[in-house]
Amino acid sequence: MNETLNEVKKILTDAGIDEASVKARIILREVGNMSVEDMLLQKEVKNKDEVLAFARKLADTGAPIQHLLGYADFMGEKFIVTPDTLIPRDETELLVNCALDKINKISQKKQDTINVLDIGTGSGCIACMIAKNAPQAEVLALDISSNALQTALENAQKLDLIKKVVYRKSDLFSALRKGETFDVVVSNPPYIRKKDYDNLDKTVRDFEPKSALLAQDEGMEFYKKIIKQAAKYVNYGGYIAFECAKGQAREVCILLERNGFQVSDVIKDLSGVDRVVAAQMVLMSDNTECFSI
């Protein structure tokens, strides 16, 4: 096994692939069907040729390993990913867990179904993991990309969540029907600034959808658009939660406080970045925008 692992690492290292050691072990696990125990015991890789061929393909294309595999791990599940969807990141688990916490709080007072809205669902990983872990919730997931919605639908079917998650093509709130409101709204919107986008790792910049990454107005474009309209769609006492990039949480908090919400949580990731902001709707909605931004 060590021989194969070293060969894979050399192929990746020679091609300038970042984190070659980590990716080599992923290849042995996912392509070579090697468990952690197998690796510790240095068991023989039975399909060495297939493993090396995958490593060479990764080296030649420079593509994200998840695209070549066709899936990404997220919260213990494998989600189909394509060039039309963002690859789920570990940090996004914080957003899911925050939403689950708010659902549980609301459930203590509300016996009915908890209605959840996921704006910009992409692969559907957030919507699916909320639906899987909150049996009292029903999720409406929106995305402007038809291709992303198709992938999200396939993920819901694969996880047997098709009855709990509804998908709808929508530019932010545009496809919502009159009177539709929600107890919890979540979004991991595009938030990369133009100057930062140009400096992204090429596996992100060249292979993941630009429309799901890049935001104008110093990365604040979609936070402003969503928060400006959110008061019409979040029930009184309900919550809205966002994932944020480094340095954005403070401005997101200010926008929320100016538009009928009271910030309840600012959650740091393992790097100490303020990654998730959550806020509670504290104004009774009259179906109008609260304040201009």
Language-model regions: role of each:
Residues 217-280:
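Conserved Class I SAM-dependent methyltransferase catalytic core
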Residues 1-47, 51:
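A short N-terminal interaction module
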Residues 16-17, 134-136, 157-162, 233, ...:
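Short helix-capping segments at alpha-helix termini
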Residues 29-102:
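Conserved AdoMet
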Residues 191-222:
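Mobile active-site "lid"/loop adjacent to the S-adenosyl-L-methionine
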